[in-house]
Every structure is written in structure tokens, then in C-alpha cells.
């Protein structure tokens, strides 16, 4: 379309504005000291471990909320936390409860928080976890939260090695009743797994978007909705970066999760790439995408049904988690199934799968997970793989700045993970994870995470996090042994540290 249409899309990309480096900190400092704040509307938006604490309380049946979409709103959860007493809980959930209550009470007194953090590693990381190593080698971040009446916001200024500066994880939100309207970007994670999500994870940089979401994830007081149990809904329209095959591609994202019976949580996720430079991107075009209208793959005005293809690049699917008490501890079974193409309005094909199991042993949370994104193309005449996260029009794939928006291990990857989380009574954290990976076994069209055409990897990673007054220090490392076709096995090690200082 012409430039007139491009101007109409400015709102979708308003958080992608680039500024010169000499203005970057000046802009932030002016806002930093002029805004009085409270705490974030979401749990763990600055400290992801708080989300894992919340999951612990839900698994132990202490909190009644739907928590498979990160981040979860504080509203409704905070009221339940304030009623809990330490002496009534077993050791593991009592530690998580105290961490969450401490965070909540501290920020009520402080009227918000301002944080400066520095992350440094010996190298860039190929794989990113929910709460561990980051992708970039060096990042300086300054964050300020603020709150005024129904308004809430966060300004997050980031400066990376090489001189790039951006405002990822900055947002402005307005709450009305049980709903929330947000403009900006926020790390998200959709699904019950800890090592990866097939559709939305924090592996890639957060997508700037306009979001309309429920402002709580607890039971509704509406009698017509009470049968859902605790539930959460979000719908978002975002815009990807300009440095891709189709610049400024739009991204539609929608998620609904609910807990209809005690111990069971179910979720439905959907995302669709559409628009961008050279592609139709009006409101009517978006409506055609979300109503699954078709076009001829050969570009003709009419064609046989076999040549019809849905507009846009769709991913959609389901996830579940069922927790039960066995031997006086929770056992959780969970899974996720996300497909890329649809035969009709409801039958999704080209499916990738993830399954996991978690429980608590010797004071630790232990989880085992397996996923497979080796997916045969439903429209291919052979058993060709290399289709997941890929698209004939959107050649950069379901990625942002080269990293998959979904799985940390990208497409054509088999993953097996064993992990341990330990929360200490003094607030310290320990995580250890072992990954066994097989990447691009068919040696065709390797994903960006590969060092060669095909690779087998055994990886050990972990971190220890401790608080010292207003300081929060995380030390971690990863070591991986990779076997690449026609090359000697190679061992790579990475050490990282993240230091956060609370300024108020």
C-alpha cells in the first residue's frame, strides 16, 4: 500500500521509536525524577521468579487463580495473599508466600520502585530460559514504575553492547473495571512449561503492542461466568521490527486460560502475522485474517480448493496442566500443542508438541519436559520438515531480531530437559537445568540457533541469586558440548552475572 496507509499504522509502532544515543538518557532522566510511583499491575514483570512463586502456591492449592499466562495481574491475587498465615502452610509454599507478601508490602510502603541493573556475560547466549541467562552479552537497564489513579506505567531504558538503545518492556496502562488497556511492550510467556513455550516466550525481545486484557485472573463475580473458574483473557495487536524480509509485519496475539475444576488449568493461544511493507494492512485486511479468509497460493483471483491458503501466518493451539496431591505433595502433568496451518476454521495441522511433569522432592521443585518442533509440512508432497515458524511470504519467520517468538530452541528441534528449582528461606534462589537437544536432524534449512547444518547438544546451565539489602545479585553459567556433522565435538562455556540495585 501507499505511504498514506503507512502513516495510519504509526499507533501500532509507537513504542518502536528510535532516538539518538545522546538523547536516550536525557529523556529517561527527566521522567525518572518527575514521576511518583506505585508497583506494577503485574506479578513478576521485573522479577520473573515471583511468577514461579505464584505457580507454587497454585499447585499447593493455596491460591485460586489461573496462572499459565505470564505475567499475572496482582488484582485478586493480592487480596488472597493478605489473608494467608505462614503457620498454616507447609515449608515450600510458605517460602513462596513470604516472598510474594514481602514484595507486595514493600512496594505499598515505597510507592513503587526504581531499579538500575547491569547484565554481563562472556558471550551471547543461543538459548534463553524463563529466569536465567539472557540473549545479549552486555545490557544496562534503568527502570522506573509509576502509578496515578487508574493509570500505571513503566519506563525501561536499555543500552546494549554495540551502542543500540531501546525502550523494550516500557508501557502505559489504564484500568477500567475488570479490564486493562496497555500500550507498549512486556515480556510474556504463554503455557505451563518452564523451559520453553511453543507460541509465546521471552526468547525474543518483547513485541510492542496495543493490548486489551482482563485485569485479574481469578473467579468472576458474574453468575454467567462463574462456571469458568479463575480465568484470564488478552487480545493484542503488535508490530515487529523493520529489519526483516517484510518490514513492520503486524502480529495479532490472543490468549484465554481458565481453571474450570480444582487442579485443572486449560489454555487456548492464537497468533497471526499479517500486513507489513508491501502487504495489505488495513483494518479490513486484519478482519480477513482473523476470520480465516483465503487467497490463492499462486496469486490468481480464483483457484482450486487445494491451492487456497489462509491469509497471514497463523499459529494456534491448546495447553493444559493438571495438578494433584500425592504423598503429601503436588504432582503436575502438563502439555502444549501448537500448530501452524488450518484445514478449516478449527482443524489445526503442522503441530508441534510439548509435555512435562513436575513435583517436589527434598525441598526442591523438579521438572522434566520434552518438546519436538520437527514438523512435516502438510502441503508438501514429501515428508519435508523445516516448516515450523516459517512462511513463504514472511521469510524471516515467526521471529523477532532472529530469535523465535516461541520455542527457545526454534524449529526442527527435539528437546529433553531436567530441571531443579530451590527457594531458600532467606530469599535466595538456585536453578539447575540439563538440556539434551537434537537440532535440524534432516540437515535442511537450519534455524538461526545452529552452528552448522545439524547439531546434537548436551547443555548444563544454572544460576544462584541472592539479595543484599537493596542489591540483588545473580551469578550463573552454562556449558554445552555440541557435535556438528563432519566436525570434532566442541565444548563452549558461558559465565554471566546480573546485578540490580533498587534506587528507592
Locate each region found by the language model.
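Short loop/turn motifs that connect adjacent beta-strands in outer-membrane beta-barrel proteins
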Residues: 66-68, 89-91, 103-113, 147-153, ...
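Signature for the C-terminal beta-barrel architecture of outer-membrane proteins
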Residues: 189, 210-394, 411-412, 416-418, ...
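Transmembrane beta-strands of outer-membrane beta-barrel pores
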Residues: 120-124, 148-150, 157-163, 176-178, ...
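Outer-membrane beta-barrel "beta-signal"
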Residues: 209-212, 256, 395, 466, ...
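N-terminal signal peptide c-region/cleavage motif recognized by signal peptidases
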Residues: 34-36
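N-terminal periplasmic/intermembrane-space "pro-region" immediately following the signal or transit peptide
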Residues: 38-131
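Well-ordered mid-protein domain cores that form the structural environment of catalytic cofactors
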Residues: 133-227
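N-terminal secretory signal peptides that target proteins for export/translocation
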Residues: 1-21
